């Protein structure tokens, strides 16, 4: 169990949460939610001890499993060792034992200490540590061939999965996971869900994956109104319960403001008259109400709407024998084509979900389709095999997986966006930015200083302004909060153009897609139907 008593955190004059007291009970699985900027990551750091609360006390269990966000902290270590380091007492004992065995001669004191260390290793299941770590890595799709490599040799997505295995290792009393599904493919997300459902300690997770929160969490701890309110059930249950809480709090705010307005009106009308005692009484009442201002919600909802300047022709895309061969081995050591030659055609209005494990070629196929297309092609990428023909009036809007690299540095948010349509007025640019929560002076923010979520929202501004009839989105939900993901989901469902979408977000897969391209075992399978139908087909084939 983790106990929080009277905890307060502020940044300058901004209150994130104040005098929060709550308990996270063993056997329960908590989702920590709230809009961006509400203080989720700050509160998580207070729970782990990385940050000290400005006021209040946090009581933690001895063994915490923590998903660390620093991908480079373990570059000097083997992958398998990085996982084992998740059990700090075991790793300390293993290191000390190795140092003693490396001594030229052992003293009696050293021998006694070795006996103590062997006891610790045994108590912590250290003799099975490498086997247990390997099972975790395999579940997270880190192949055996990588386990002995240094962390510095891995790509970013692989590093995150190793760090997730580190957090899960050693049967911790509590798990604190900040965005555990980032960079996980759908199969790995399902494996993680099953693991967490069987976990018997205390789980606290920050996630912007609604489906994951609904599947895993027994409770939601929501940061809003400068406090933390815990709701029973998953994310959707919390949303329904929060409506009544929000209605009550906002009604109290409205009543308070109306009362202040009435009192000020009385003061203005009678301050020069004979009713001075009544005026003074009302002034005191205004002061009292002003000092007891009720907190307001931090929730901000972006507005995303993808329109088309003009529709494309009926036949949007013809793909003939497309594949890609790299000159150097892939990160897992394999060579040859990423997938067998793929042939397919798309019609106007198709909404295709590209899904499959990481590294199976989804982004490679996207880049192959865009090779040779001005403004959206990757200049460092060359399609090695096959032909691609885009149809009449095809206008492509592209959201790359490395979306921050698509935004020019050394300028402001408004200037960068204005560059794509100089004919638009400053007011029109501000209006588009405002839809994606860049309000007031935020339009003058330097592009170099944008967070991942802000960069994503800025790219959506560009796509809305360009009004393409084909949207190609490669992992657009990374770094978005739940409100932004829900807005994107709704906009893609309403969009009348053609969509190619790489995502591991199950809600997007189920609710947006009308067609599936599944990448598996070096092959791309084209299923002309939604995800639910595809799952039914797979189930029938398995019988």
Report the location of each language-model feature.
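Conserved short loop/turn motifs at secondary-structure junctions
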Residues: 152, 270-271
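Intracellular alpha-helical coupling/juxtamembrane segments of multi-pass membrane proteins
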Residues: 241-266, 270, 279-295
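ABC ATP-binding cassette signature C-motif
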Residues: 1-251, 306-543
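Short histidine/acidic/glycine/proline-rich micro-motifs that form metal-
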Residues: 123, 272-273
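Active-site phosphate-binding and catalytic loops of NTP-dependent enzymes
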Residues: 147, 294-301, 386
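Short low-complexity stretches enriched in small and charged residues
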Residues: 18-22, 273-278
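Proline-centered turn/helix-capping motifs that create local helix->coil transitions or kinks
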Residues: 128, 274-278, 287-299, 331, ...
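Short secondary-structure transition/capping segments
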Residues: 252, 256, 300-307
């Amino acid at each position: 169990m983790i106990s929080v008593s009277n905890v307060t955190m502020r940044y300058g004059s901004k209150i994130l949460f104040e005098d929060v007291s709550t308990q996270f009970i063993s056997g329960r699985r908590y989702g920590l939610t709230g809009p961006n900027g509400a203080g989720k990551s700050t509160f998580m750091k207070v729970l782990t001890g990385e940050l000290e609360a400005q006021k209040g006390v946090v009581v933690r269990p001895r063994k915490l499993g923590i998903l660390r966000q620093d991908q480079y902290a373990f570059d000097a270590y083997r992958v398998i060792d990085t996982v084992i380091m998740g059990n700090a007492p075991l790793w300390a004992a293993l290191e000390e034992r190795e140092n003693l065995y490396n001594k030229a001669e052992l003293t009696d004191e050293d021998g006694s200490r070795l006996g103590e260390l062997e006891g610790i290793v045994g108590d912590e299941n250290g003799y099975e540590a490498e086997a247990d770590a390997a099972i975790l890595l395999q579940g997270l799709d880190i192949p055996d061939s990588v386990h002995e490599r240094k962390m510095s040799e891995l790509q970013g997505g692989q590093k995150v999965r190793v760090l997730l295995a580190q957090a899960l290792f050693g049967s911790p009393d509590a798990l604190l996971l900040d965005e555990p599904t980032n960079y996980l493919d759908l199969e790995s997300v399902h494996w993680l869900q099953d693991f967490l459902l069987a976990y018997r300690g205390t789980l606290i997770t920050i996630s912007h994956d609604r489906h994951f929160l609904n599947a895993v969490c027994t409770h939601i701890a929501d940061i809003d109104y400068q406090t933390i309110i815990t709701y029973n059930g998953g994310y959707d249950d919390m949303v329904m319960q929060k409506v009544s809480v929000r209605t009550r709090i906002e009604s109290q705010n409205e009543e308070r403001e109306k009362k202040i307005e009435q009192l000020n009106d009385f003061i203005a009308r009678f301050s020069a008259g004979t009713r001075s005692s009544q005026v003074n009484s009302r002034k005191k009442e205004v002061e009292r109400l002003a000092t007891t201002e009720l907190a307001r919600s931090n929730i901000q909802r972006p507005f995303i709407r993808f329109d088309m300047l003009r529709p494309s022709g009926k036949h949007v895309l013809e793909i003939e024998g497309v594949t890609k061969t790299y000159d150097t081995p892939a990160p897992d050591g394999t060579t040859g084509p990423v997938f067998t030659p793929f042939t397919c055609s798309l019609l106007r209005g198709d909404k295709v979900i590209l899904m499959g494990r990481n590294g199976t070629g989804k982004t490679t196929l996207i880049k192959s389709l865009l090779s040779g297309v001005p403004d959206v092609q990757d200049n460092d990428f060359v399609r090695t095999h096959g032909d691609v023909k885009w149809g009449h009036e095809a206008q492509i809007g592209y959201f790359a997986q490395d979306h921050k690299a698509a935004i020019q540095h050394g300028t402001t948010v408004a200037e960068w966006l204005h560059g794509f349509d100089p004919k638009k007025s400053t007011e029109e640019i501000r209006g588009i930015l405002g839809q994606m929560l860049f309000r007031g002076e935020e339009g003058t923010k330097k592009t170099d200083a944008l967070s991942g979520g802000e960069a994503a929202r800025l790219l959506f501004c560009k796509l809305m302004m360009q009004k393409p009839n084909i949207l190609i989105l490669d992992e657009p939900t990374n770094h978005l909060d739940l409100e932004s993901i829900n807005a994107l989901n709704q906009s893609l469902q309403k969009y009348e153009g053609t969509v190619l979408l790489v995502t591991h977000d199950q809600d997007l897969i189920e609710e947006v897609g009308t067609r599936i391209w599944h990448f598996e075992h070096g092959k791309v399978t084209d299923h002309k139907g939604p995800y639910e139908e595809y799952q039914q087909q797979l189930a029938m084939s398995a019988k």
